[in-house]
Amino acid sequence: MSIKRFVSALLTGALCLGVLTACGSTQKPASSGVSADAQRYSTIFYDAFDTVTQVIAYCDSEEEFTRQMDALHADLLEYHRFYDIYNDYDGVVNVKTINDNAGVAPVQVDDKILGMLELARQMYNTTNGKLNIAMGSVLRIWHDYREAAEANTNEADNKLPEQEALDAAARHCDISNLVIDENAKTVYLSDPDMSLDVGSVGKGYAVEMVAQAAEARGLKSALISVGGNLRAIGTKPDGSQWSGGVENPWNASDVYTASSSYVSGVNMSDMALVTSGNYQRYYVVDGVRYHHLIDPDTLWPARYFDSVSVLSPDSGAADCLTTGLFCMSLEDGQKLIESLDGVEALWCTPDGEVIQSSGWADHEKK
């Protein structure tokens, strides 16, 4: 993530968790179980998943909040290390380890990796291949060109990948070559030129697991934002719901400000809100923006939408779905969402239209 987008993520999270939570729903769902005397606390972390994490929670004391946040932070950093595809860590077997051993040997991994990979494989089928973590060879090419563009001082020097190189890399994206042995707890890439890229699932899955662990430790009322991926735990002490917002993709800037706007605000209790957009990670060639959401069919940035948001009880599934939906037609996406219980979506099209799934309005702030 560039410095500009890092600042954007920080301010986006602050606005999502500050402005929107200040005016939560006055509905009275089932009691959150948190004490009516609980106080509101907040904290920010900067060292997980290359983005900004902000948490707001209601706790009975600052000591309780600190205990909860220390544990949540430690959990998040553990997932960060497990899902890293670029770096090694002492004593840690992670996704990079799996990639390094492609075609060599199965790698025994932690359950936190197995669970994430199983979800990704399931969502590959759900999205008819539009969510494919086996596309690492193709995504690495785009990543390298984007990184080179960020290093350029002259935009005119930015370049695009050659189609021939993309086609060659695409021959090593068959997810059937991802071999998972649940009994032995091993993962093996049978194609030596294949690599995993879990950017479309890792953060969302981690947020879900971290939230569930926090709940198991007794946290009853919180809103977690990791780079804008929102996950609500329970309700506020007064019974009102948390709130989240979908950023206006046409008003998004490198530095997010109070003048930026939302196309929708939703009420959230034990729900996740995740957005994927073409304004988040990109570079420009000849005046055209080339973002990071690559269509598996074309091997180029998907052009169906400017952003897609998913509201779901599960943050991991929501993360996968935003990527999958971004890379498929509106008609196919609507059919998919209507087939999933408790899941809603919002699409922002290149011509400025905002389209909601049939149940989105039930969650929308009035």
Model-assigned labels for residue ranges:
Residues 2-366:
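Mature catalytic core of soluble alpha/beta enzymes
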